[in-house]
């Protein structure tokens, strides 16, 4: 989860989020090197007393500033495309959960089980217990097994929403009349928080998401207790 004054991303708990963090560092390094080079050139231009007014043609320079940016763009595009394909790839999910956005709560349905569905509302500030997080706690958490591939089907009953859990690298739009899908897999158990990330009305800020990732045996006991 996020902390006050945090400047970086949340800790990654999924392979996709780890790849996104690596890509962020990779891209940031390239941007830093380019910015340093530009600043160095500007400094030289402002401090040097040498002038050259007879330059009419510089074929070598034009070649360099054409080829070098192309190489840099390729170095950015290749890992980006790799991650995009990884995020879209869905192979034999072990569990499917359907998520519907409403104004202003989420509803969940475990499609592999009969009659296993519930609504998830934010817990009001007046009902919070010691240790609970304001504006992030819900009355019904989404319990999922860790170390397995889970497919999320996401849509909306009314207006545009967006189902986002940053620590898992997830952000998928919930669009009325359209069913979007994404996958998640957590490498460790715990509670992971998210929120609606598409402005959807006056109570947009009060649509938290809480995923509780547990071992498979614990998940099976939880489902058995509800059926």
UniProtKB/Swiss-Prot annotation:
It catalyses: 4 Fe(II)-[cytochrome c] + O2 + 8 H(+)(in) = 4 Fe(III)-[cytochrome c] + 2 H2O + 4 H(+)(out). This is Cytochrome c oxidase subunit 2. GO terms for molecular function: copper ion binding; cytochrome-c oxidase activity. Component of the cytochrome c oxidase, the last enzyme in the mitochondrial electron transport chain which drives oxidative phosphorylation. The respiratory chain contains 3 multisubunit complexes succinate dehydrogenase (complex II, CII), ubiquinol-cytochrome c oxidoreductase (cytochrome b-c1 complex, complex III, CIII) and cytochrome c oxidase (complex IV, CIV), that cooperate to transfer electrons derived from NADH and succinate to molecular oxygen, creating an electrochemical gradient over the inner membrane that drives transmembrane transport and the ATP synthase. The keyword Magnesium applies. Binds a dinuclear copper A center per subunit. Cu cation A2 binds at residues 196, 198, 200, 204. Component of the cytochrome c oxidase (complex IV, CIV), a multisubunit enzyme composed of 14 subunits. The complex is composed of a catalytic core of 3 subunits MT-CO1, MT-CO2 and MT-CO3, encoded in the mitochondrial DNA, and 11 supernumerary subunits COX4I, COX5A, COX5B, COX6A, COX6B, COX6C, COX7A, COX7B, COX7C, COX8 and NDUFA4, which are encoded in the nuclear genome. The gene is MT-CO2. The chain crosses the membrane at residues 15-45, 60-87. Pfam families: COX2 (PF00116), COX2_TM (PF02790). Belongs to the cytochrome c oxidase subunit 2 family. The lineage of its organism: Eukaryota, Metazoa, Chordata, Craniata, Vertebrata. Its cofactor is Cu cation. The keyword NAD does not apply.
